[in-house]
């Protein structure tokens, strides 16, 4: 029988790269991993906390289509401030943290980076190491599966039909230069008592080809009917 494997781990070292870059002695390796986990959790919690403070961004619904509108004057968003990945590079006296984000309006706010650095220093107790945080804006946000998953989650929490949310997510990928996409949602869809899975696929998706650059994410969505699981595969290109 065929066994399923994580598409990112399957391609690690070929089309996917590590998100942490550092060396450590074997006895200190676990401490380094725990420190990376604390850094990533602290950044995500900071984004989540500031998003909940209030937002003027709207997701406008029309009878024919739904459009996400981003107000640049606002500090946070409902489904736009999504971190795609966090890269950590450690040197002897410096920790470099690179945050890749779709729409970095929140972190461009005056004093936001300084506040985040203080929170991180308290979390990891970095006394002898200097912390350096930089922000990288994702050039094509809608080719990132994390952003699409967050969009679907926002739609489902607002009682939008799951099929409509999936189709709209597929439509958003037309703005990006990709060759294939697959969206799968599992759980009590539509409030039904029996859990099931629905899937929509468009274009090519060569999961068995290692040289094919495929981005993937698995995202849980908490609804009033229970937890739904969203999986998104995006075939970017072939190397």
Swiss-Prot record:
Locations listed in the record: Plastid, Chloroplast
Molecular-function GO terms, alphabetical: rRNA binding; structural constituent of ribosome
Domain spans labelled KH type-2: 43-139
UniProt-listed GO biological process terms: translation
Subunit-structure text: Part of the 30S ribosomal subunit.
InterPro entries: KH_dom-like_a/b, KH_sf_prok-type, Ribosomal_S3_C_sf, Ribosomal_uS3_bac-typ, Ribosomal_uS3_C, Ribosomal_uS3_CS
Pfam families named among the record's database cross-references: Ribosomal_S3_C (PF00189)
Residues annotated as signal peptide: none
Record's GO cellular component terms: chloroplast; cytosolic small ribosomal subunit
UniProt xrefs under PANTHER family: 30S/40S RIBOSOMAL PROTEIN S3 (PTHR11760), SMALL RIBOSOMAL SUBUNIT PROTEIN US3C (PTHR11760:SF42)
Annotated Gene3D superfamilies: 3.30.300.20, Ribosomal protein S3, C-terminal domain (3.30.1140.32)
Region (Disordered): 50-80
Gene: rps3
Entries under NCBIfam families matching the protein: rpsC_bact
Sorted UniProt keywords: Chloroplast, Plastid, Ribonucleoprotein, Ribosomal protein, RNA-binding, rRNA-binding
Family named by the database record: Belongs to the universal ribosomal protein uS3 family.
Protein name per UniProt: Small ribosomal subunit protein uS3c
CDD domains named in the record: KH-II_30S_S3
PROSITE patterns: RIBOSOMAL_S3
